Amino acid sequence: MFLLVAGATCYFGGNGFGADVMRPLGLRDVRVGGEIGRRIEVTITNNLLVLDADRDFLPPFKAKSADTGYIGLGKLIDATVKFAAYSGDPRVDALRRHLVAETIQAQEADGYIGLLAAPHRVRGMWDVHEMGYLIFALLTDYQYFGEERSLAAARRAADYLVQRWPTLPADWCVGTDVAPHVAATGLERTMLALNRQTGDGAYLDFTLKTRQLPEWALPIVVGRRQGIEGHVYAYTARCLAQLELHRMQPNPRLLRQTERALDFMLQHDGLHITGGTGQCEIWTDDQDGRGDLGETCATAYQLRVYDSLLRLNGDARMGDLIERTLFNALFAAQSPDGRRLRYFGPTEGPRAYWPTDTYCCPCNYRRIVAELPAMVFYRTAAGLAVNLYTPAEAKLAVGKDVALRVRQETDYPNTGRVRLLLDPARPVKFPLQLRIPRWARGATVTVNGKPAAGTVKAGAFFAVTREWKPGDEVTLDLPMTWRLVKGRQRQAGRVALMRGPQVFCLNPAQNPVLAKLDGTELGYLAIDPASLGTPVPSDVVRPGGLACKVSFWKPGFGLGNKADYELTLTEFPDPDGKATYFRLRDFSVAAEDELLAGRDR
């Protein structure tokens, strides 16, 4: 192990070198239900398949007349390819083929794929960013569907960038008003993927020598400054590229930027209770919950970094972070019906939808939702690990290539009961690992109705190793108690209500007596913990979802025994939620955020 700085917490275990301890299943090998599956479905049917790519995405790439600009076509194609692979839906596949064909047709003879006129190419604002994701998407199309023309087009575009790069002036990005790593967000990961796919060392050399990915060591820059160096999305995207390079060329130095980001989020107030980070797309540590909080692009890349670290070392906290983030920050970035998407997800005050289907956040939302099926189950060296609890089915090989089908049955996060039904082709011995969230103290595991051997520890994976036979059943019970989680910095002295991985919020529209109050005014209400009872049904966020009936006192000096209001709190993705933190009469019942346990300060 290593530490980033003296006194910092280390988030990497003993597998600093070598192969991953977990590997994701293929998108075609998993089927997901529950709220995760519903979000996948509505993103496909109510968003992807109803947007107008021929009007909003493709024309600028045919015209090539702009001097600056960004669309997000590469991100759209990448999401469409993955949705097509996962769903097998012929409508999605037709869209994939159309987008890819139109993009390749728009490619110029020299390899350029973009929307800028010749004098502005590469050096123009976001041109490298756009091209990098187009190359990545075409490569994704080849990887999932074997389209040779997509691979050829990706290579031509990458070669164009590699060849043009030496012609750029040293200060080329100054005119873009952003730092060099921000202007080229995503490029290094694209080049590494091309190198792995083709074996062409030119792409690796470009990443190592020209882009100098191993040397990147930018500190956390708090606040929006010239060059926006503290851009969370750009920062985490480059962290992800370093992690992937570490898999190819193991070096502890390549872990340090990710360590730095985790240290800031978990130890120094960079992470909000919903899993979102940063104001105005930039690292911040004051826990301001209003306005432009938690850019969706950053949320998507945080999830990818957590997934990468989970695979690298099997740290259950990364699974906890994935779960917290997707049920709150991520799903709050989408309307419940799937059609509208957000750039930001504040915990206080009004939330706004992005007005178009283009640009980075809507497209990165689609991409990360398309990747969620691969975050449910993971292969381990000897068996299977379950990371996310949701109705799901998977097929894989365990032991010496023994075919296994596994099915999850659960209404999680409504309750904490999860049934796993295992159906191996023949009896086979392997470890089944279950992630036990940090909040789930007192969790129990039974196998065929009998308690599993060993201690079930919150915040770790619990392994059941035995010879599994067709029809074996594992039942996991996670205690789902209410938690009043302490706020920090600007939220100090107040608490947020949580149950399992979910954060709950106050929507004035659901509580007419408060309809005219702003999020700040709502935050002055004091919650009565004694009034917390069994959750009640609510379809505001999802069919079969939950809400909480709870009593509150008005602001004031008295705070008598009888509460002033009985209000309904809804799940955080409620589109009209305006308050998340509330006052508390007796702070002794408040709890620390379990994800931040072990904070240095």
What are these regions (language model features)?
Residues T43, T258, G319-N328, A333-L421, ...:
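C-terminal beta-rich recognition modules with glycine/proline-rich loops and embedded aromatic residues
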Residues G16-P90, A94, R121-F145, H181-A202, ...:
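Aromatic (Trp/Tyr) and acidic
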Residues A440-T465, L484-R490:
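Solvent-exposed beta-strand/loop surfaces of large extracellular or lumenal domains
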Residues M1-Y11:
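Bacterial N-terminal signal peptides
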Residues Q105, V162-Q163, Q212, W216, ...:
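Amphipathic alpha-helical segments of tetratricopeptide repeats
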Residues A118-V128, I135, L151-V182:
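Asp-box/WD-like beta-propeller blade repeats and closely related beta-sheet repeat scaffolds
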Residues R91-Q107:
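Aromatic-lined substrate-binding rim segments of carbohydrate-active enzymes
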Residues F430-Q433, V464-P479:
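C-terminal beta-strand-rich structural cap/linker in extracellular carbohydrate-active enzymes
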